[in-house]
């Protein structure tokens, strides 16, 4: 089983900085979001003596989120901080404001260019995918171990794509994506038919009590 948790709201969200390798910290709201996810996860693990590994991106917003979850679960092991779980490398744009980064942005000819670098020193989509996937599949038996992974939107998307058997060429060909909101929880498991199944996807029910599904909150193409 793989439980994927995106970090909570971070300072780069509120200060209008670029994401990527900007090493932003959780906001108070972000900490509360992750705490809510952790409390709900603790209910799943209560009374269960199952072996669990917790892996987290080494960027502060993810590692701090992982620590909050580990404490709520009463996790006794060591959190594994993994550089390969970082968000897509945005090169020289890391740490810049969104306005500053626009001056360095290299627009691709199409959204499906997989070997294009948006910023000098940054990664291509193919490089990003390979880093995430090769790193995780080499350090863990993803079909058999219980893994709780705290990472970033793009990283979680890449893990989901690989779980579904898709490489980046297929993702681009189908123009496919999944939404991954801050502090959301996604659960991947092998089902009773031995299929790679998605049991939860972008679940934010711990943040939306009393609200609707949020169907009008998504960004639609007009």
Where are these regions (language model features)?
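Short, active-site-adjacent cap segments at secondary-structure transitions
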Residues: 11, 61-63, 87-88, 155-157
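Acidic, low-complexity terminal tails and accessory targeting/binding regions
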Residues: 1, 47, 71, 75, ...
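Generic structural signal for well-ordered alpha-helical scaffold segments
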Residues: 35-43, 129, 133-141
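Generic beta-sheet signal
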Residues: 2, 52, 145-151
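Short, well-ordered beta-to-alpha junction loops that form the rim of enzyme active sites
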Residues: 8, 56-59, 84, 149-154, ...
């Amino acid at each position: 089983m793989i439980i994927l948790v995106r970090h909570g709201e971070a300072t780069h969200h509120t200060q209008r900085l670029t994401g990527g390798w900007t090493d932003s910290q959780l906001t108070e709201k972000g900490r509360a979001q992750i705490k809510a996810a952790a409390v709900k996860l603790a209910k799943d693990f209560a009374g269960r003596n199952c072996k669990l590994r917790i892996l987290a991106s080494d960027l502060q917003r993810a590692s701090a989120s992982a620590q909050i979850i580990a404490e709520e679960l009463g996790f006794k092991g060591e959190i594994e901080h993994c550089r390969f779980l970082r968000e897509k490398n945005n090169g020289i744009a890391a740490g810049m404001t969104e306005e500053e980064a626009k001056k360095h942005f290299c627009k691709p000819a199409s959204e499906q260019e997989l070997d294009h670098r948006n910023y000098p020193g940054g990664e291509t989509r193919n490089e990003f995918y390979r880093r995430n996937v090769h790193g995780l599949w080499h350090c863990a038996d993803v079909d058999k171990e219980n893994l709780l992974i705290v990472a970033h939107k793009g990283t979680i998307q890449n893990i989901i794509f690989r779980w579904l058997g898709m490489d980046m060429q297929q993702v681009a060909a189908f123009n496919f994506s999944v939404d991954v909101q801050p502090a959301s929880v996604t659960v991947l498991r092998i089902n009773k038919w031995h299929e790679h199944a998605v049991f939860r996807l972008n679940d934010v029910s711990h943040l939306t009590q009393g609200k609707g599904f949020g169907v009008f909150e998504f960004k639609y193409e007009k």
